[in-house]
């Protein structure tokens, strides 16, 4: 039989009242914070991704697809100018 490390067992932790008091507050709080982060649009600003209505503008309705194998830099310049 191995020696004891002095740590509480997992079953002992999840059956304690203190565990559930703490986690009944923190788990819903994390869910609400994540929902607010996404629903307010802050996630778009933090990560720099375009919002759903910014993918296609009035002037640029096509997909920026590079088709030329030997002149991709020129096509990238054209796409950059259209922004």
UniProtKB/Swiss-Prot annotation:
What UniProt keywords apply to this chain's record, in alphabetical order? Chloroplast, Electron transport, Heme, Iron, Membrane, Metal-binding, Photosynthesis, Photosystem II, Plastid, Thylakoid, Transmembrane, Transmembrane helix, Transport
Binding of heme, residues: 23
Report TM segments: 21-35
Enumerate the GO terms in the molecular function aspect: electron transfer activity; heme binding; iron ion binding
GO biological process terms, alphabetically, are: photosynthetic electron transport chain
Any one cellular-component term (Gene Ontology) = chloroplast thylakoid membrane
Q: How does the cofactor attach, per the note?
A: With its partner (PsbF) binds heme. PSII binds additional chlorophylls, carotenoids and specific lipids.
* Pfam families named among the record's database cross-references: Cytochrom_B559, Cytochrom_B559a
Q: Per the annotation, which location comes first and is thus the protein's main one?
A: plastid
Where in or outside the cell it occurs: the entry states: Plastid, Chloroplast thylakoid membrane
Named cofactor requirement(s): heme b
Q: Could you give the subunit structure recorded for this chain?
A: Heterodimer of an alpha subunit and a beta subunit. PSII is composed of 1 copy each of membrane proteins PsbA, PsbB, PsbC, PsbD, PsbE, PsbF, PsbH, PsbI, PsbJ, PsbK, PsbL, PsbM, PsbT, PsbX, PsbY, PsbZ, Psb30/Ycf12, at least 3 peripheral proteins of the oxygen-evolving complex and a large number of cofactors. It forms dimeric complexes.
Which family does the record assign?
Belongs to the PsbE/PsbF family.
What functional role does this protein have?
This b-type cytochrome is tightly associated with the reaction center of photosystem II (PSII). PSII is a light-driven water:plastoquinone oxidoreductase that uses light energy to abstract electrons from H(2)O, generating O(2) and a proton gradient subsequently used for ATP formation. It consists of a core antenna complex that captures photons, and an electron transfer chain that converts photonic excitation into a charge separation.
State the protein's name: Cytochrome b559 subunit alpha
Q: Which organism is it from?
A: Glycine max
